[in-house]
């Protein structure tokens, strides 16, 4: 997806000056941007919202969803599975190395009462390699209190190397 000449609206930050690295941006439960280098897409790398992943690679999602964080583990995990309203799936096929960071930006709108319940599923195929950076941030001037329940599953198959970093800057009302 490419950015056009449209202006950002409301609390959505501008993304027109972004480098060409794999990137997914969500505000609330909506995708506002997906960016994938053509060479990585040709190798089968997928980075998209959960609903789209269920359409594109349902067998992969079904095989690994809940394997690292089972809903049977505790009430918080069960609540996440029952109530997540958005999220993402990153799939890297076997033997694919990504030489630039993969980045996810998840924005919680502080003026919205939509719960911030996300499920992130990262599947790194055999002998794949990637660096993943996740940013969670509240935006806006509101002070609406909402719940937040995030579950992040990283499935690293044999020989896979995954470096994971997260920066959380959620507001005090989440």
Tell me what each language-model feature is:
Residues 1-174:
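Glycine-rich and polybasic anion-binding loops at the starts of cofactor/ligand-binding domains
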